[in-house]
Amino acid sequence: MKMKNKEYENTQKGIAKQMLTCILCFVVYLIMLLGVLNRSPGFTDESDNFIGGMVVASGGRMYRDFVSQHMPVMYHICAVLKMLGADSVYEFRLYFYVVLAVMWSFVAMHYKKQFGQITAVGTGVFYITNLFTFYTCCILAEQVQSICFVVLLMEFLLFAERKKLDWNNCFMISGAVFLSFGAAFVSAFPIFAIAVAFLVVEIQECIRKKYGFLQSIREIWQTFWRAIVTILAPFALLIFVYAAEGTLSVFIYSAYTVNREIYPNYIAGYGSRIVMSFVEPVINYGMAIADGCRKLVTDFGITKEYLAIVRNVICYAVNVIFWVYYAKKKNIVQAVAIVYFTMMCGTRGFTHEFHSMPYVAVTMFMAAYLIGQFTEYFKTCNVREEQISEVQKKKQGICYAGAVVIGITICIYCVQYVGACRSILLTGQNFCSAQKNDVNNIAYWVHTLTDVDEKVLLTTIEPQILVEADRIPYRTGISAPWMYEAFAEEEMSNLEENAPRVAIYTPEYNLWGYDLTEYAPDFAAYMSENYTPLDEEKFPELYIRNDYLGVAKAIYNE
């Protein structure tokens, strides 16, 4: 009986310790994230997520009531934040940071036993220190992708070690695949790369066991069928939901057809050729390394720009060290697979702007992993000085040098963090939560001239005004030339039937060199005929439907 009581006490202590560690991780991550809260103002892609979330939270249907070429996960996350009370950029970010802190804490606790505390906890810490680059602090799909790609790499390393996938592994892989692809379509490329890496490991195992072709196929199926089922399940559920809502066809058209067939015409063909999408990141990575090394010499100076260059080069160095270490310690073929996955994570960039954050996250995991391995190595070298070989001394020297570089980098970020916190405390900046109460702000009049659930016609790619006014858009298929090309007939038909009373419209609106009057002449003519500016001098972009103009002017002039 005493033995059982002791076991129970030990179990309870273990659970308490786990909970305390998890809470500490959450607090540390959240405090670090708060340091970048006001690092950049509202951003187009971020505001788009807000608006989509507001539409969903108000009962609207994605891709039917809110036209978008993006995948749905970020909109649904923002919808939850809106329902929790988020009413400004400040509040949306604050709530989202809580979500990020929970996700990073979960990853740290889940993989702490397999990878060690330094690697599991350190990955999130290192990643967050990279969010001081402009726009990387925003609520973007890249934030979700970053966590998911780290999970996929961790699961691959575990599979390469164990050669098996249990249900726990499958659920983690399924969640990472669904959230990353559901947040951004381009996640398909790194997902494909890591899937190939998993397959390579299993094929190597079949070759090692000298299986025949048919036996190898059976073995591969036996290994991966659970993962296939768990990965397909959430996508099947999503398809079922959209089919039930009657939005499945428009979802496929918006998220796939527009991105593959129409949008590439406006971005130099990017994404139109599938084969090149798997090759270009490799080429771009090589060019990024060459450019970084060149600028490291030619652009020397004590500036933020040069610090960014140094940071980029350190990331490339971490990649190479990890690849070489893994190839030497584990398997060179698997190392090559990891190389390709790393490059595919940088499909949108490698140079510390917000599109490159998934690549940065994977690199930060590699840095934390190497530090964890070096720490274990130091423990094995805890012997008398004369027993340490020259090779071991050299390895220790390299490890110490790496620790110094990492320490300096962390100190630099700590200085930035303190400065950011000071800015928040001094300015009390809350990012437009009070704009709808300021009569000199257009958001006030959009809010005043519309009812609570009334929609506003938005014709630009900057939805910030609607976020400030706490109003949702009347579709958004006019704000970009590729979206108008995709939805012109539907947009004009809807306007003829049910035109909003208030519109945000700029006749001179130009996006990437495309004038609205040129890519949407029918719409421009319709606006000229049916809408009039409320106050052309003070708010030239605020238009009122002609039959509501008299009432609006009376309210405005009170």
Locate each region found by the language model.
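Perimembrane helix-loop-helix junctions
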Residues: 8, 190-235, 239-243, 365, ...
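Membrane-interface alpha helices of multi-pass inner-membrane proteins
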Residues: 169-187, 191-198, 233, 339-347
